[in-house]
C-alpha cells in the first residue's frame, strides 16, 4: 500500500535523524505505529554501533557546561537567559509550543530553568547525537510531529504545568500565564499547535473554543489554575473539538466546576447545543 503524505514526511524525518535509508525508516516506523520518537528510540537501541548512553554522558556534561553563563548560572543549572539562548540555538521559538517540547525532554522544573541532570539524562534517553546539530535535528523532528501524535502532545502538555511554573515550589499557575500557554498549545495561528476549533453542527461554520474559554475565564475566574484544571482542560478540548454539541458532558460527570460553569455559559449563548435542544432563558 502506498504511503500517505504524512507517512512520507515521517519517513524523511527518520532518515534525516538517523542517517539511514527509506526502507529501514519505514520498517521501524511501521513497528512503532508511525510514532517518530518511539521509532527513533527503537532504531538507536537496536544498533550497537550508534553512540550509547554511557559514552554520550561526558559529551553532554561538557555541552551543558559550555552553555552556562559563569556569572549568572549556578554550577548545575541554566538560568532563564542561558536556557532561552540554548533553545534559540536549536531553532526553538521560546514563544511557541516548541519550547514546551524541549522543556519536557530535559525535564525542566520551572520556566526557563534547565538542570544538569535533566539535560544529560533527557538527551541520553533520546540517543540523539551529543552535538548541537544532532539535538537540533532531533527536537525539530519531534516538534513537527507533535500535532499528529496525541500521546506525545499529552505528555508535553502535562509537563507544561511543571515547566510553566515561575518557581519549582509553585503549586498552581497564575491565570494570565496559563492563558498564554493555552494559546501556544491550542491557538489556531500558532505553529505546531492543535487548534481548539470545532466544526459547528448547527451553522456549518466553526466554533473557536479557545477564544470562548479565554473570554469566559477572564470574566468569570479570578483564581489560579490548578494541576487538575490544567490537565482536564486538555481532555475537554479534545472532546469538544470532536463534538461541538458537547453531548459528552453531563452535570453528573467528574469535570471540575470551572468547566461545568463554562458549559453552562456556552449553552446560555446557544453554543454547544444539539439540534432541537431547548436552552433555558
Swiss-Prot record:
Protein name: Defective in cullin neddylation protein 1
Gene Ontology cellular component list: ubiquitin ligase complex
The protein's role, per its UniProt record: May contribute to neddylation of cullin components of SCF-type E3 ubiquitin ligase complexes. Neddylation of cullins play an essential role in the regulation of SCF-type complexes activity.
Coiled-coil residue windows: none
Cited Pfam families: Cullin_binding, UBA_4
Residue span, DCUN1 domain: 55-267
UniProt cross-references to CDD domains, sorted A to Z: UBA_DCNL (cd14350)
Annotated keywords: Ubl conjugation pathway
Intrachain S-S bonds: none
Amino acid at each position: 500500500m502506498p504511503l500517505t503524505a504524512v507517512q512520507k514526511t515521517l519517513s524523511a524525518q527518520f532518515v534525516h535523524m538517523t542517517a539511514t535509508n527509506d526502507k529501514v525508516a519505514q520498517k521501524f516506523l511501521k513497528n512503532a505505529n508511525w510514532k517518530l520518537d518511539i521509532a527513533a528510540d527503537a532504531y538507536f537501541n537496536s544498533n550497537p554501533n550508534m553512540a550509547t548512553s554511557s559514552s554520550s554522558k561526558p559529551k553532554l556534561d561538557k555541552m551543558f557546561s559550555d552553555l552556562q553563563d559563569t556569572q549568572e548560572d549556578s554550577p548545575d543549572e541554566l538560568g532563564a537567559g542561558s536556557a532561552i539562548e540554548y533553545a534559540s540555538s536549536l531553532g526553538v521559538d521560546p514563544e511557541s509550543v516548541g519550547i514546551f517540547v524541549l522543556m519536557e525532554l530535559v525535564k525542566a522544573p520551572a520556566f526557563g530553568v534547565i538542570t544538569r541532570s535533566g539535560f544529560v539524562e533527557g538527551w541520553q534517553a533520546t540517543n540523539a547525537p551529543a552535538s548541537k546539530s544532532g539535538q537540533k535535528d532531533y527536537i525539530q523532528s519531534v516538534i513537527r510531529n507533535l500535532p499528529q501524535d496525541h500521546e506525545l502532545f499529552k505528555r508535553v502538555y502535562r509537563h507544561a504545568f511543571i515547566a510553566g511554573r515561575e518557581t519549582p515550589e509553585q503549586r498552581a499557575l497564575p491565570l494570565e500565564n496559563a492563558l498564554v500557554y493555552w494559546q501556544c498549545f491550542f491557538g489556531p495561528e500558532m505553529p505546531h499547535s492543535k487548534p481548539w476549533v470545532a466544526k459547528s453542527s448547527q451553522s456549518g461554520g466553526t466554533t473557536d473554543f479557545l477564544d470562548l474559554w479565554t473570554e469566559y475565564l477572564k470574566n468569570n475566574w479570578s483564581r489560579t489554575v490548578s494541576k487538575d484544571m490544567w490537565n482536564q482542560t486538555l481532555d475537554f478540548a479534545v472532546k469538544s473539538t470532536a463534538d461541538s454539541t458537547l453531548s459528552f458532558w453531563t452535570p453528573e460527570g467528574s469535570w471540575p466546576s470551572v468547566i461545568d460553569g463554562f458549559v453552562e455559559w456556552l449553552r446560555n449563548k446557544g453554543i454547544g447545543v444539539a439540534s432541537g435542544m431547548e436552552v433555558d432563558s
